[in-house]
Amino acid sequence: MKNTFVLFLLLAIAKGAWAVNYNTVPLPKQVQLTNDNGFLLDASCVIVYNGQDAQMKRNAHFLSAYIDKQTGMQLAVTDKAPKGTKCIRLAVNTKLTNDEGYKLTVGKRQGIVIEGGSARGVFYGVQTLRKALADEAKGQSAVLMPSVVITDEPRFPYRAMHLDVCRHFFSVEQVKEYIDILALHNMNTFHWHLTDDQGWRIESKKFPRLHEIGSKRRHTVIGRNTGLFDDTPYGGYYTQEQLREVVRYAEERCINVIPEVELPGHALAILAAYPELGCTGGPYETEPTWGVFDDILCAGNEKSFELLCGVMDEIADIFPSKYINIGGDEAPKKRWEQCAKCQKRIQEQGIHGDSTLTAEAKLQGYFTNRMEQYIKKLGRSIIGWDEIMEGDISQSATILCWRGIEHGMKAALAGHDVIMAPTAYCYFDYYQLDEEKVWSKPLLIGGYVPLQKVYSYEPAPAELNEETRQHIIGVQANIWTEYIAWRSLLLYQMLPRAAALSELQWVKPEQKDYDAFVERLPRLLTVYDQEGYTYCPSY
């Protein structure tokens, strides 16, 4: 057997074939090389998908395109394999209990088989095969595939990255590229931050002033709130059809898009369009600087809820996601303390402050619960930043923890599902190299989150018991764009830290090894190069 394989290998090399490496990023759960003679992938192979499932067909065409880009070989796609043809078979295997799990088998007899617990699982098997192909295989007539059985599944069901398009706007094509990168890293969720003080990015047919006025600011601050401005109007929004287009694009890549509409704070773009919804009546403008601002939506004004509920109707019609993110962070209560309508609401609701929270802080709990009740009628659930815990909120609310690990632990102990995204490990708008931080080049918001620190993070702390740990449903990294205005810097901040993040999301703690990860990383960097992605070359 050994001599036969050696002969096979020599013949493969003579034909210009190159071997692959299955130690990809994220690392598969189990990679077992077998004694079969392996498989020679060449242009005569056909990709066969099983059944009439549209996602399976897309998976097959994705794989064909990936192999073409990686090797130059153009493989046909079919739902029926001709007899005697070498095949890559894609199929659903109901014996795999995790919908996102897969089994990848390579051997001389069976060829290449990717089985998934669902079409989504097959998609992740396709990504592993894509990343396993050697960069050196480009232009070669064949690729040697060592025989192997890979069994794999993700650790967490929620694996996400976030993008702020309010401080700076990114086009539909740039957002699609961002989604492509998430798919490459086995992520399944895109958190789209669509509204903030600095811009409203959603076309609203019910409340058109939101995008007509709220999407534009008259100028933008230069540097870190220097008081100097560029005197250039700035704006942009997505039409409802463009939003649907992005949702479809993401769904094809097994990614769920969660829209975020900030409330009650970070709402100056709303107030610029509808000043009667503020506590003072204005005047307001779409904010040209960065920070946290006192003017928020009036909790005592019924028209605030009329607008928000109307917007949620539109959001639910565009986005099929189970979740709608309602923000809830950084909402100062100064205006509510001075607002007659808000004080009347506090009295009507019988809200009283205590030693830990003021009545105005608890009023936000009323605001959150009221919006959650409406969103539930739409068949959806809410996610909110961890500040929404500062009030009597429903246990059904999912908490997105950003201020520190302790907030996530508190939420999990209270029975909430929790997504971990702490600034110290998961803010990719922070510097990643020490020299960047020292010299402030590029100009960023600050902070320091190098690659190794991202990799070191453990989202489900050992202090939690097993039952509570089950409430940690995933991990997310955030990119805020106060100082990130163009594609190349966005991708530079994202990569390769997204690779480290993907291992937090996918790989169990006992498998993690930073040195081994760094050894595997260069192979993924070749994919970045092929795709034209900018990335930080030092780590």
Spans of model-derived segments:
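Contiguous, structured surface segment used for ligand recognition
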Residues: 20-156, 489, 505-532
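Residue-level detector of anion-binding/catalytic polar loops
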Residues: 74, 188-189, 256, 381, ...
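A generic structural signal for well-ordered alpha-helical segments
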Residues: 67-68, 182, 250, 375, ...
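Active-site neighborhood of glycoside hydrolase catalytic domains
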Residues: 270-276, 280, 285-397, 402-410, ...
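Flexible, acidic glycine-rich loops studded with aromatic residues
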Residues: 381-397, 402-539
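Bacterial Sec-dependent N-terminal signal peptides
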Residues: 1-23
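Flexible loop/turn segments at secondary-structure boundaries
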Residues: 55-56, 169-171, 197-203, 264-270, ...
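Feature activates predominantly on carbohydrate-active enzymes
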Residues: 96-305, 309-323, 370, 374, ...
